[in-house]
Structure formats: structure tokens, C-alpha cells
Amino acid sequence: MQDVIAEQIAEGSWDVLFGAGWGYFVPQSVEGSLRTDDKNPLDMLKSKMQVALTPEEFNALRDRRAAAMLERTNYFPKASEGFEITLEIMTRKALDILSNNNKGFFLMVEGSQIDWGGHANDMEYIRDEMLAFDDAVGAVLDFAEEDKNTLVIVTADHETGGMAVLSGDFEEHELVGYDFATKGHSAVMVPVFSFGPSAKLFGGMQDNTDIGKKMFQLWD
């Protein structure tokens, strides 16, 4: 499936895409390829935009359209393992590029491995990935506070692990306990945080599909 997604990405019309998985963008004849055919989505991308495969190339990205695949496989190391180009750095670079469009832009930033930590019932994994995501959110809020015309929405499509926070006295600096109900997804309601113009539209309880509908209304 990843090889097909790589082809669709190369054929798409978008401005910025940063992530991993360069092995799916090069033909099987190239060392490190994860494809089983001779298709070369990477060449198609390079004909359209600036492309980075290394941290050095990423730092040099300047074009209005840019792509980066910074790992061979389709995921990055854990936040705790360290990686030169963090989610925050990718977010700031994306904002730098997209903000040059005077028609505005839409940017989605995902902290994908928070979910993986939930599946593993690994609190330290969840914590580290949440902190990395929080840094990325901070980058967006820095931009929005200066721009004063950017709506920021932070949410999730589901909760994973059925995590519960147990006893502990915050004022006494006691460690708070926790437990998990499942290694799968739960039906727990997820929070929605918003900041900027029309942020009040996203308060209260709502179906998660309403978020997208409201965003389209604002875009129009």
C-alpha cells in the first residue's frame, strides 16, 4: 500500500509535505528501495519541486513547493531516541514556506506516535511523543500570535489505550498513578482546543466530522 501512496503523493497537487518513507519513492534497482517495481515517484516529485532526503537538504529548502522524506521507512524514530529534524522544526519550516502564499494556507501537523504509545500501554512513550507534539503546537501558536489572522485547531480522531489517571496529591508532589483499559482504540471523547479567528466555533461537544465542515465554511 505504501508504494501506491507514494505514487499518489507524487501525482498530487500540494505545496508542502514533510515526513519519512523515501524507500517507497525510488525504484527497486536503487539501494534501500522498498518498492517491488521500477516506478520512480521521486523523479516525478523532483520535476515539480525542491526535494530533501537528508537533514542538510531539508535545512536548505526554500522553494514555494517542497517535499522531504527523511527516513527510509515510513516512520521516524521515537522522540526519546532523538532525530535532528524534529516535528517542531518541520512545522516551523512548513510555516515559513506556506506563509508566502498571500491567499492563505491549510497545514496539518500530526504527532502520530502518541497513538503507538497508547497501543503499547507505554506511558513514557506517550509522554515523550506528547511533549514533542506540544513543541510543534507551540511553533504554530508563535506564528498565529504574530500573524493575528490564523486559526489553530488541536484535536485527535480517537483516544488509544483507555488511559485513566489515578490517585496522587499534586500539591504534595506525589506521583499520580495511571492505568489502561485496552491496547486498542476507545470511545473516550477527545478534547478540541482552538485559538485565533472564529475559535469559538469549535467549543463544546460536537461530532468530529463537524470540525471539517466548519473549516470548509470558514474557508469559503
PLM regions with names:
Residues 1-220:
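A post-motif C-terminal structural segment
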